[in-house]
């Protein structure tokens, strides 16, 4: 199982997204994603997302908020468990990201991007403030179904 984080950094009605267009053999090639990545040994989810956001964007996050958990069984040959965060407080200047092109996307345009099918489903839950635990099943690049539990 691969443990990872994902964060949607918010500022002035926009969300920082990365267009994954720089790395060879990237499973997310051509897609738009929030920032995040895999845990390093001994990290908490919060430590992981703060480190990943800094490495990918140059921004230092303060008090990222855990808003959901995602499970992707057998996605590209691995089971992925992803801690989803939002962040409103940060400092720093954007860098030339090694992951792709960074862009502040107006929130109303987020679902118009080339996203994974699952993102179209769970991203509105984030905006509604619903804490969720969801499993999304893919066959190749096609989502086959999902289950979700909401927590109050």
Spans of features found by a protein language model:
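Conserved N-terminal beta-strand and adjoining loop/helix that marks the start
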Residues: 1-17, 38
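Short, charged/polar surface micro-motifs in flexible loops or helix N-caps
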Residues: 10-14, 23, 88-93, 129
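N-terminal first-folded block
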Residues: 15-19, 23-41, 49-50
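Unchanged
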Residues: 39-62, 72-125, 146-152
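Catalytic phosphate/metal-binding cores of nucleic-acid and nucleotide-processing enzymes, i.e., regions
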Residues: 68
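Charged phosphate-binding loop/patch that engages nucleotide di/tri-phosphates or the phosphate backbone
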Residues: 127-152
């Amino acid at each position: 199982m691969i443990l990872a984080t994902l964060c949607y950094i918010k500022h002035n009605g926009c969300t920082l997204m990365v267009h994954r267009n720089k790395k060879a053999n990237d499973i997310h090639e051509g897609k738009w994603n929030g920032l995040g990545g895999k845990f390093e040994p001994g990290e908490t989810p919060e430590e992981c997302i703060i480190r990943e956001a800094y490495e990918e964007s140059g921004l230092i996050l303060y008090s990222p908020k855990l808003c959901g958990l995602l499970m992707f069984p057998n996605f590209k040959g691995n089971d992925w468990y992803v801690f989803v965060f939002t962040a409103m407080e940060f400092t720093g200047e954007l860098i030339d990201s090694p992951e792709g092109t960074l862009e502040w996307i107006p929130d109303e345009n987020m679902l118009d991007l080339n996203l994974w099918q699952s993102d179209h489903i769970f991203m509105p839950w984030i905006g509604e403030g619903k804490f969720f635990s969801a499993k999304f099943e893919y066959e190749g690049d096609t989502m086959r179904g999902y289950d979700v539990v909401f927590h109050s």
